[in-house]
Swiss-Prot record:
Any one GO MF annotation of this record: structural constituent of ribosome
UniProt cross-references to Pfam families, sorted A to Z: Ribosomal_S8
Protein's name according to its UniProt entry: Small ribosomal subunit protein uS8
Family per similarity comment: Belongs to the universal ribosomal protein uS8 family.
Protein modification: A modified and unmodified form exist; the nature of the modification(s) is unknown.
Gene behind the chain: rpsH
Length: 132
């Protein structure tokens, strides 16, 4: 089954798995999803992920979710820019999530990165989603 919005699909799978207290969740593999997961891992929101190759040639990403005292580390994950309504922000207008306690994940000309990395690199871009 093809998805029209792979980022929303990834976010929904993570949110649903954490509501059910799953330790792992899998999603179809792609470079964009892997780059988003790299950011989430670097920021400490997931334990990690692995690429699983199937004999049919398709790949899946198996994500290890992270919990602290039995509660999900990701309290809130919300899509900002959607295919029907794109949201772009310059470096001066990058949103702060809960006064800096959360992050915004952006797609910039220099790749997918967290908001504080985009500020350091002095680039803006499309605000994909926020995590708290």
């Amino acid at each position: 089954m093809s998805t029209h919005d792979p980022i929303s699909d990834l976010i929904t799978r993570i949110r649903n798995a954490q509501m059910r207290s799953k330790s792992k969740v899998s999603t179809p593999g792609s470079k964009m999803r892997a780059n988003v997961l790299d950011v989430l891992k670097a920021e400490g929101y997931i334990r990690g992920y692995a690429t699983v190759e199937h004999p049919s040639g398709r790949s899946e990403l198996e994500i290890e979710l992270k919990y602290f005292d039995g509660e999900p580390v990701i309290r809130e994950i919300e899509r900002v820019s959607r295919p029907g309504r794109r949201v772009y922000a310059s470096v001066k207008n990058l949103p702060r999530v809960n006064n800096g306690l959360g992050i915004s994940v952006l797609s910039t000309p220099k790749g997918i990165m967290a908001d504080h990395d985009a500020r350091d690199a002095n680039v803006g871009g499309e605000v994909l989603f926020t995590v708290f």
